[in-house]
Amino acid sequence: MMKNRVTNIHFVGIGGVGMSGIAEVLHNLGFKVSGSDQARNAATEHLGSLGIQVYPGHTAEHVNGADVVVTSTAVKKENPEVVAALEQQIPVIPRALMLAELMRFRDGIAIAGTHGKTTTTSLTASILGAAGLDPTFVIGGKLNAAGTNARLGKGEYIVAEADESDASFLHLTPIMSVVTNIDEDHMDTYGHSVEKLHQAFIDFIHRMPFYGKAFLCIDSEHVRAILPKVSKPYATYGLDDTADIYATDIENVGAQMKFTVHVQMKGHEQGSFEVVLNMPGRHNVLNALAAIGVALEVGASVEAIQKGLLGFEGVGRRFQKYGDIKLPNGGTALLVDDYGHHPVEMAATLAAARGAYLEKRLVLAFQPHRYTRTRDLFEDFTKVLNTVDALVLTEVYAAGEEPIAAADSRALARAIRVLGKLEPIYCENVADLPEMLLNVLQDGDIVLNMGAGSINRVPAALLALSKQI
């Protein structure tokens, strides 16, 4: 096993949300963990507080003494630490391969899907915790109740996100898997072929042993398309009563969702029960159904499921409520932060905001993520952005890409303006966004700060400015 052969593990890009969680769990398992990153952030500070050596920047000396070097997809092969490791014949592996090794220590539950992975993983961990199963978890966002995105539990299960963006989820060998949905995103990875995208998810499901079980959402058209090709045991979930687990009587109760769960899953007691989910949105009802399916499969009680969903405190940057901020002209606005950056998940989050806060004017501050995504989904972005009451667009977060003509925020603003409903406000520099928002907001508004790039710094800056008023 790895523990008998490996002592020192070095992470290149340790501050990334996927990397930091794995590093923390390995540290808690007793490995000597170190890492490096170009930028300090909350994750690197947290790891440092645990006693993990985190180096600023990347130099060859950082890998000296390492038994293995772990890299994120953002790390280039020209990185000096990667080059030095290869020269010293130190194995260099992707983070997904190290996550796969972690799953050798526990029974793995892997959550895949284009949207909803982080929330579903968090809900699953919450319910398993409420059931006394004390799971290990590695999540792509901070679980608010735990104050971290990873935790080493004493129980037999590890719950983790499975990343399809680079097909690295095919390294994992879980005993249970979830597919929340399949959408056409990260299509460069799949040669812009829907067939290859479908096959990757089929292969992911087939990574389970014969005694495993998958939970598949039949509300997703692409998931329904792969069902005939899935040969491993699976159960379906969704809002349709043909699913093995489905929901009815769905109600918005403020920022919560109340619904009835119906179970007609083979090998389980048939019946129904009511739950209250402590977060808004019909899309989160689906995420909760996936977590409920996994929980029932591992033997959690209905009471534990109800407790885990009602007590769920959310996850960082997934409809994360910061509370009211003061406005210069008097009054307050409710600040909510969200990671959404694909039109489908944005539409779901905006609908959740509308349902939870019916009387409020909805103001969206959005930073598109990647020029290629903006180009490929331009019309979809235009449609979803046009559904809010006021819109502030900041420039595309490139994520290492070169700009593409007519695939930037100015082009989006022009296209939305032509539709005649909104007059988008363009903010070229994200650093100027907090002050601009304070001048746009009105008393009683909800402002949704959304995107997967540097816009994540806006809430803290906006709160700081607001306190000076």
Curated annotation (Swiss-Prot):
Name of the gene this protein is made from: murC
Disulfide bonds: none
Broad class of enzyme this protein falls into: ligase
EC number: 6.3.2.8
Pathway: Cell wall biogenesis; peptidoglycan biosynthesis
Function: Cell wall formation.
UniProt keyword ATP-binding, yes or no: yes
Membrane-spanning intervals of the chain: none
Chemical reaction(s) catalysed: UDP-N-acetyl-alpha-D-muramate + L-alanine + ATP = UDP-N-acetyl-alpha-D-muramoyl-L-alanine + ADP + phosphate + H(+)
Database matches in Pfam families: Mur_ligase, Mur_ligase_C, Mur_ligase_M
UniProt protein name: UDP-N-acetylmuramate--L-alanine ligase
Binding locations of ATP: 113-119
Natural source organism: Neisseria meningitidis serogroup B (strain ATCC BAA-335 / MC58)
GO BP: cell division; cell wall organization; peptidoglycan biosynthetic process; regulation of cell shape
Cellular component, GO annotation: cytoplasm
Keyword list, A-Z: ATP-binding, Cell cycle, Cell division, Cell shape, Cell wall biogenesis/degradation, Cytoplasm, Ligase, Nucleotide-binding, Peptidoglycan synthesis
InterPro entries in the cross-refs: Mur-like_cat_sf, Mur_ligase_C, Mur_ligase_C_dom_sf, Mur_ligase_cen, Mur_ligase_N, MurCDEF_pg_biosynth, UDP-N-AcMur_Ala_ligase_MurC
